[in-house]
Amino acid sequence: MPKMKTDRGVAKRFKKTANGFKRKQAHLRHILTKKSTKRKRHLRAKCLVAKVDVPAIARQLPYA
């Protein structure tokens, strides 16, 4: 059986941790002037992927 392919887009966006997968938060690319400094600071923090989405990401990262 051939090696399974890793989804490269998913590999760049998610990192496997002991508690699941961590990801960057959205809403920090553009239209930043109307967002408060506090909101932008909190959006910089990484967060965990929802439990319901973990199996799909795990399928796309077979060697993670």
UniProtKB/Swiss-Prot annotation:
GO cellular component: cytosolic large ribosomal subunit
Xref: InterPro entries: Ribosomal_bL35, Ribosomal_bL35-like, Ribosomal_bL35_CS, Ribosomal_bL35_sf
One of the Pfam families matching this protein, by short name: Ribosomal_L35p
Keywords annotated in UniProt: Ribonucleoprotein, Ribosomal protein
Domain of life: Bacteria
Any one GO biological process: translation
Similarity comment text for this entry: Belongs to the bacterial ribosomal protein bL35 family.
Name this protein carries in UniProt: Large ribosomal subunit protein bL35
Gene this protein is translated from: rpmI
